[in-house]
Amino acid sequence: TQQYEYHVRHYGHPSKFGYKDICALWKAENFDAEGLMEKYYNAGARYFMSQGTHHDHFFNYDSKLNAMNSVKVGPGKDILAMWKAAADKFGMPFGISEHLGASFAWWRVNKGCDKTGPYAGVPYDGNDPAYQDFYYANQEHGTENPHNAFPWYTENKEFREYWLRVMEEMIECFEPDLLYSDGSLPFGKHWVDGSDSASME
């Protein structure tokens, strides 16, 4: 794929240099949340939404549930907290977008390996058990058709429970005015009575 070729050109082979290593390269040394928020406010914005996490399972805040986050890896900054403080300064409601729900199934591409060439059969770094918490033990989704985005959501019960804990963590840490999920609210019937014990099935 074009993405594979770009990765090899710019970073090296994914069996040797994977996404976890790319995350460590991100420094955000010029990131100025307050300066940007001032520009947005002056341009007419009256609310702000920051990304908490995308499909890559990297968190933009100091999570206790996921060590692959912007405080412990890469920038050394709590990006979400900085955005929240800037929004508060300008009196703007603050929202968080999360894209974690699809990550378990989507991340199956990191379990593959080249079928030809010098690295044929050498597992990509997503197979490294030392990073299983980040890359997931998601072999159940296979790697035969990595370009098929479905299933969008996994049936894996442990991951569903993890997703819910992450949502609770973000809400408790940042008290957002809005929490946006990418797509329909994940995993069908859950949270139906508003309690922690509501069905996740």
Where would I find each of the regions flagged by the language model?
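Mature catalytic domains of secreted/periplasmic carbohydrate-active enzymes
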Residues: 1-201
